[in-house]
Amino acid sequence: MDYNKTINLPKTDFPMRAGLPKREPEMLKRWEDMDLYNELLKKNEGKPRFSLHDGPPFSNGSLHMGHALNKSLKDIIVRSYAMRGRYTPYIPGWDNHGMPIESAIIKEQKLNRKAMSVADFRTACHQYADKYIGIQMEGFKRIGVLGDWEHPYKTMDPGFEAEEVKVFGAMYKKGYIYKGLKPVYWCYHDETALAEAEIEYQDDPCTTVYVKFPMHDDLGKLSHLDKSKLSFVIWTTTIWTLPGNLAIALHPDESYAIVRNDDNGEMYIVAEALVEKVMAVGKVEHYTVVETHPGNFYENMLAQHPFLPKTSRLVLADYVTMDSGTGCVHTAPGFGADDYQTCRRYGMDMVVPVNDQGRHTDYAGKYEGMLVEESNPVILNDMKEAGSLFASEEIVHSYPHCWRCKKPIIFRATPQWFCSVDSFKDEACAACNDVRWVPGWGIDRMKSMIRERADWCISRQRRWGLPIPVFYCADCGKPVCTDETIEAVSALFAEKGSNAWFEMDAADILPKGFACPHCGKSAGFTKEEDTLDGWFDSGSTHFAAMKKDQGFWPATMYLEGLDQYRGWFQSSLLTAVGAFGEGAPFKECVTHGWTVDGEGRAMHKSLGNGVDPADIFNENGADILRLWAASADYHADVRCSKAIFQQLSQNYLKFRNTCKFMLDNLVDFDPTHLTKAEDMPVLDRWLITKLNELIEKVEQSYNDYEFHIITHAVNDFCVTTLSSFYLDIVKDRLYCEAADSAERRSAQTALYLTLSTLAKLFAPILAFTCDEIWLAMPHTAEDDARNVVLNDMNKPFTAYALDAETMARWEHIIEVRTAVNGALEEARAAKVIGKSLEADVHLTVPEGDVFLADENPAALADLFIVSKVELTVGGELAVKVENAAGTKCPRCWKHSLTPNAEGLCPRCAEVVRHLPDLL
């Protein structure tokens, strides 16, 4: 007889093969049709809010792995809070203005920016930004990110621009914004100032020089020496800045030596601490220290410039160090922040002998018209010929490059608009104390950056940006920015967008009869031509998008990459504190690392080591990408490679197939008829107690944003607790007990509670798969069967929980089971048995082993998946395996000493007796 018909064979429509690349787009369509995002908001309407404010990606280029990591983490967090009873609006946004888009359209469309009208050029930029918003949006949706995709915020939208103008106006009114001539990062390839966040450092080769500046006027202090033989020796890595030298800085308290070259009689003034090093570099083998003086001894002396007809003043500065160079610091106020401040303190005029295009001006004499990098070898050769070069070396140093064009930049003084961060640094640092930083060291990093930063250069010499809303009086020439002008500009931008600034005259923007607040005249005004730094745009999103449009402030969370400590986190904090004095615009600040290849290297086209998210979607599925984001300790750099995704796919299959097994065995289960705890075997309650532990661990890990702990815990639960132990044991109950027996229904109850819990716990991470599981499983009337995310995560099932003593007993039993399994493997290898049901086990336990001594041998046989267990108390733990006695039951394969006429064991005979229609 075929007893297969009498067995509860597992069956479900849930497929073993995931087919995610094909299945996920179908699920996305279903989510869209049911308006899942808004349904989720309705579910939690009126409950406490969790608001993750989206840091806007730049609308330039297609989706990359950095985007994928960032958006996956955000969606995991938002979903996890939504499934724990929080109202979770998520409004995606984009950062649109800035040089990257200008550079891209000039290159792609071969546009001549200077030959086009400003309005036409800006329109082309707008269209380009819109194009990539669409491309990126589709990629983010493909990941499964839930959000208000119909109403994203964009920094180029008129409404946003109107509110950003108000942020500028508020900071200007407080005196935090000013225009000044001071050194800034300058990209002469793109002809614009740059913020610190727009700088990347690369190792570049360079020639470093030690240059002699002959003594010109010693103020009568060194008349006993031959002045014609005496020189200050400076050191620099930027030869091209030497035409801009106005001073030599010494430390006031350090000792400076006058060193005589015993071979030629020349004398050099260098820091005493660096004499040996400098003489070695200059290959001066025979020298004598003639005398020493503190740095302040030389103040206001004059040295002769080595190749231009001018002098250089000796000044004092505390920043001069003794760890490199000569202790005599080349000082060019047009090319350095410290240089600028020092020369300003001495009342010296600003000199900037390099123009916007990076070429020397006429101030540089014979070098006029040369690009700075072209002038380096020429100046070097001229100094050699003039005898002013003391020494030179070839080194590799870290040098700033433009983040967009990747070319070296210079530090150059130009008229720019600045935000005086010094004016509110203390308030900004204090605001950090009210923020939860993840990782915890974030607060120190942010405070350090704020304390050490210079004033923020917020102006750009670009066309595609928000115009700086400042006018200039034609009579007195002073800048004009008042409440009245800000209101007028904001209203104009709200109605017509910021293009109107370039298309309208100042008189048509300002209120009729407007008079200059400085001189009272109203003869005429001109408009500022510079645009705002893109970081000011994105730094204003907390007000322009979040507070104004979304109606809440501050955000619960900002979550971005590590680079945003000097980028969006900082610009948002500075505008919030500077404009409104309301503290940080976020309660929590979470950061993730960079995405790198499998070997930890940055991904570059030249290395061919990049990973495209689209390839992951098409080959593995978005759930595997989400699992990748969740499985990594994302606070460090996150590795990605095909091998990593293949391994993750294997882990995914373990989860999927474990859930499939449970679904298979729940096909006839009605969850309204759960087995009560008091009617449930201890093994089933043991599983639910372990499930309770998992629930608590996952809950805490979601709170801590430690998703890799969740993925590890769920994987371990599926592999170790379920597949390797519980599911293996209960197969006999599920398949061979009567379909509606108490024993089978109890196991199904445990499976149902477990599957429901796993689907909910893991739904924020495996959004597609857990929803697929949810759709395939049975539900109660309290469930929202439409989508798993519309349900709250399960809380521990305390009614089923075992006490600590019972759990300890079962941990011991599991240890013994491991020993039994080892003995079974040895017997199988020795050909004593085949399947474990072909074995009888003789188990000896110590007399004091109260946990095992009281166990029912029949229950132990089920636990060990053998036909029989004989238990002996007394002696060391020992396991003996023998061939099972009796007859093999053709239905359950257990061996029985009392089979019926058909060979069925008593249990199977009883089950089959109640199935006459199958016989």
Stretch-by-stretch model annotation:
Residues C187, C402, C473, C516-C519, ...:
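Short cysteine-rich clusters marking metal-coordination/redox-active sites
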Residues K42-S103, I234-T241, V315-T342, Y346, ...:
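N-terminal catalytic cores of NTP/NDP-binding nucleotidyl/phosphoryl-transfer enzymes
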Residues D2-D13, R17-L20, E26, R30-M34, ...:
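Residue patterns forming the tRNA-binding/recognition surfaces of aminoacyl-tRNA synthetases
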Residues R313, D318, Y346-G358, R462-W464, ...:
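Alpha-helical recognition segments enriched in aromatics with Gly/Pro capping
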